[in-house]
A protein has these predicted regions:
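Flexible "arm" and connector segments at domain edges
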Residues: 1-61, 65-101
Length: 101
């Protein structure tokens, strides 16, 4: 994967948005909705005892990622910075014998 792939993706996500077209509130609510669709997809597979539809799950996770990228942009945060921060946090947690997440 390219070093700045997440930054490039973040910029790509912004290309389809008109200036002033969406607000942080719209992005946050969209993230909640799409996260719910991810959960619903998993719930239905468990409830109906069938494999998760991976193509549908990829689609919904892509929608989640789109909203995360736009929330990051709306708040002035680069996705690569989020990744680095999270890797550092998890590395520290695991090295201290921390939790599972």
């Amino acid at each position: 994967m390219k070093k700045n792939a997440f930054t490039d993706y973040q910029k790509f996500c912004l290309e389809g948005i008109k200036p002033g077209g969406h607000s942080l509130t719209v992005f946050a609510l969209g993230l909640g909705g799409e996260s719910g669709e991810v959960l619903d997809s998993i719930k239905k597979a468990i409830r109906d005892k069938h494999p998760i539809d991976l193509e549908h799950l990829k689609e919904e996770l892509g929608d989640v990622l789109w909203y995360v990228a736009n929330i990051a942009s709306a708040t002035g945060i680069d996705l690569n910075d989020i990744l680095k921060f999270n890797i550092d946090k998890l590395t520290k947690r695991y090295s201290l014998g921390g939790g599972n997440n």
